[in-house]
């Protein structure tokens, strides 16, 4: 490996490269544009494009692409070469117009009715706050994507809008709190990414993995995660080689990959980066997922990002670590040396409490997918109920501050290891609560409900917007206040009285919490379609309209896309199951019966006195499972044939209420048959082979 500081960002047109290569006036103007949010002028764009092209050509680049994030949840790109005819030859050109604007076909991406097939024009626009980078001899330019009529058709545009809204209201709030030196507040995120690695040759033998990204059949292996021996265990050499190359490729492209380790389930791993500005973190996470999958193939493996690729062991999520940082370098979620008397810090915590409580449904919607429904509430991931963990010490501090009591910082004691040579460790104010969906972890909030394959843009868009709304209210009160400290304490009191129900420090997996949450009036949206229905509620439409995030039409379109994607995912899985049963699993069951019959006949040929009881019992069981499979497969095929052609919502409800139960029953019969069949007859790799094959 080369020198890491030299390697890091070597394929990124970052601030260092810009400062070195751009004319001084152009560089200064670009920085001013990025800081102020002003539009990029054509003359500045032309200079930047020319310098960017020269830098890219120095790295062997031949093409460029506007890299955007449509509402498919994955990235999209179209490669154009720098080639331009010049007489009998060609020259390499890249104009400012090509840098700042592209025109992909908007009708071919999900639009929820915003674009029809005959309304194809869409635009991509350069996001100058997220630096361009090089991959596969191509210059990747991060862009936003909108329709011909200006509606957002991507995940980046609303995210950037929400960051602007949060900055505006947070600066107002801080000014009202006496922070005169702050001119900008930026949300930052670090997204922990979980994934599975399995052998490529086994993946190729599983139709369910190839078509859907997860297994739809499979009996549990004798050993799963019961011994807790995989979590933080020794990383296998093949996986370590993969992680090493992944780190290097991410570092080259400016993604600050920091930590990697084995996760709880066999074959499960995690990568965590440093925090960075939210839109850059979102771009970085999309790039991370793409490189994870590509490099795994190079190492003879396949990276699975599905939320629940294997039944019976933990699924994969993505923890969204969110905080707010001022342009003066202060983390607003860091209480400093005296958090008990840091009123700005305490009011920031109250703002997040209020935002999460008032907009529970919106946060739940951002993590609602067909895949994530298999995780949430399954005693391996947070429940589908939103709650916040602060820890008893911090919760008590908030209560004391609200009451105006003389708060003192809690004394943090040293841990007694009872080994003289060991260093003294200071204990944190509170323990960690891994069952909480939204936990305060010292200087950030960790939103743990995201699915592993999801973009982090949606949850951060909602979180930024909801917190902006609350900070705006606080600013209104504080700006009219004659006694700031008294107003702060009143706001803290009101928050605890009106939104204290969202705080929960106990076991989120327990049945008692389900009952308690219901008593508190918290939402428990168990399935994705239940959540989607709340998106266009009046208060949510009003929130997004007020802060310029979504129009009513944009919000309705997203609701349609949510329903449509959910139904399509389940429909594809159901069709895959039917095909696998017809063409693989039932034939295996018939072959097992055939072998038993041959064994029985062979016994009788040896001696009529030999017992065939084992063959009879096994044959009866296998025949029963075969009958169940045929009946279940026929039912599923009929349900697929009768799939409604009505609204997207009705399709999603049909998929949830009719297809999923039939799919679950079909799987039970197939998994039982797998355990009855001889290994050489089973037509696909087993869980044991997949999970322990690397």
Segments predicted by a language model, with ranges:
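Glycine-rich, acidic/polar active-site loops that bind/position phosphate-bearing ligands
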Residues: 120-305, 314-317, 324-562
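Short linear, low-complexity motifs centered on an aromatic residue
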Residues: 73-90, 104-107, 112, 206, ...
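Active-site core of metal-dependent hydrolases
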Residues: 7-119
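Flexible inter-domain linker/hinge segments
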Residues: 1, 6-15, 168, 172-175
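Histidine-centered active-site/metal-ligand motif
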Residues: 43, 63-66, 261-263, 319-321
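C-terminal amphipathic alpha-helical interaction region
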Residues: 492, 497-694
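Hydrophobic alpha-helix feature that most strongly marks membrane-spanning transmembrane helices
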Residues: 69, 87, 297, 327, ...
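Active-site-proximal loop/turn and secondary-structure-junction residues that shape catalytic pockets
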Residues: 44-48, 68-70, 97-98, 145, ...
């Amino acid at each position: 490996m080369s020198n890491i500081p030299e390697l890091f960002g070597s394929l990124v047109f970052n601030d260092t490269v810009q400062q070195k290569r751009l004319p001084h006036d152009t560089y200064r103007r670009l920085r001013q544009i990025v800081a102020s949010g002003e539009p990029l002028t054509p003359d500045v764009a032309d200079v930047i494009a020319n310098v960017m092209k020269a830098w890219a050509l120095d790295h062997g680049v031949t093409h460029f692409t506007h890299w955007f994030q449509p509402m498919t949840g994955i990235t999209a790109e179209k490669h154009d070469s720098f080639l331009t005819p010049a007489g009998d030859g060609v020259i390499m050109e890249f104009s400012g117009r090509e840098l700042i604007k592209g025109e992909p076909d908007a009708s071919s991406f999900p639009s929820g009715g915003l674009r029809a097939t005959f309304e194809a024009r869409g635009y991509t626009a350069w996001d100058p706050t997220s630096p361009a980078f090089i991959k596969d001899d191509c210059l990747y330019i991060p862009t936003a994507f909108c329709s011909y009529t200006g509606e957002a058709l991507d995940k980046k545009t609303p995210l950037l809008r929400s960051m602007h809204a949060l900055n505006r209201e947070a600066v107002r709030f801080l000014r009202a709190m006496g922070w005169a030196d702050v001119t900008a507040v930026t949300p930052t995120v670090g997204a922990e990414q979980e994934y599975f690695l399995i052998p490529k040759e086994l993946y190729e033998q599983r139709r369910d993995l190839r078509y859907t990204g997860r297994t739809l059949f499979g009996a549990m292996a004798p050993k799963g995660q019961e011994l807790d021996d995989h979590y933080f265990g020794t990383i296998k050499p093949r996986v370590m080689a993969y992680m090493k190359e992944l780190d290097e490729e991410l570092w080259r492209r400016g993604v600050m990959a920091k930590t990697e380790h084995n996760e709880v389930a066999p074959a499960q791993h995690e990568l965590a980066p440093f925090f960075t500005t939210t839109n850059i973190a979102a771009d970085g996470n999309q790039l991370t997922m793409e490189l994870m999958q590509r490099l795994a193939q190079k190492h003879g493996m396949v990276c699975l990002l599905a939320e629940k690729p294997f039944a019976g062991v933990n699924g994969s999520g993505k923890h969204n670590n969110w905080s707010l940082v001022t342009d003066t370098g202060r983390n607003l979620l860091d209480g400093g040396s005296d958090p008990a008397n840091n009123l700005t810090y305490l009011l920031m915590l109250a703002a997040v409490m209020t935002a999460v409580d008032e907009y529970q449904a919106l946060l739940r919607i951002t993590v609602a997918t067909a895949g994530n429904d298999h995780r949430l509430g399954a005693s391996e991931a947070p429940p589908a109920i939103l709650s916040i963990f602060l820890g008893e010490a911090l919760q008590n501090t908030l209560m004391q501050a609200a009451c105006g009591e003389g708060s003192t910082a809690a004394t943090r004691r040293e841990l007694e290891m009872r080994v003289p040579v060991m260093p003294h460790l200071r204990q944190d104010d509170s323990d960690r609560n891994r069952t909480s969906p939204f936990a305060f972890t010292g200087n950030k909030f960790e939103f743990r409900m995201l699915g592993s394959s999801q973009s982090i843009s949606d949850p951060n868009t909602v979180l930024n917007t909801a917190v902006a709304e609350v900070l705006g209210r606080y600013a209104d009160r504080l700006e009219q206040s004659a006694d700031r400290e008294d107003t702060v304490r009143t706001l803290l009191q009101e928050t605890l009285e009106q939104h204290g129900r969202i705080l929960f420090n106990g076991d989120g997996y327990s049945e008692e919490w389900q009952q308690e949450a219901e008593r508190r009036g918290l939402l428990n949206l168990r399935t994705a379609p239940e959540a989607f229905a709340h998106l266009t509620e009046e208060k949510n439409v009003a929130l997004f309209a007020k802060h310029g995030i979504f129009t009513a039409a944009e919000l309705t379109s997203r609701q349609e896309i949510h329903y449509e994607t959910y139904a399509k995912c389940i429909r594809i899985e159901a069709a895959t199951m039917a095909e696998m049963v017809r063409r693989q699993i039932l034939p295996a069951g018939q072959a097992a019966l055939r072998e038993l019959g041959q064994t029985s006949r062979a016994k009788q040929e040896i001696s009529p006195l030999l017992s065939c009881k084992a063959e009879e019992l096994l044959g009866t069981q296998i025949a029963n499972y075969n009958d169940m499979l045929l009946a279940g497969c026929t039912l599923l095929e009929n349900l697929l044939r009768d799939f409604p052609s009505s609204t997207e919502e009705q399709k999603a409800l049909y998929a949830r209420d009719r297809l999923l139960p039939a799919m679950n029953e079909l799987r039970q019969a197939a998994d039982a048959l797998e355990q009855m069949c001889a290994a050489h007859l089973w037509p696909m790799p087993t869980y044991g082979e997949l999970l322990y094959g690397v």
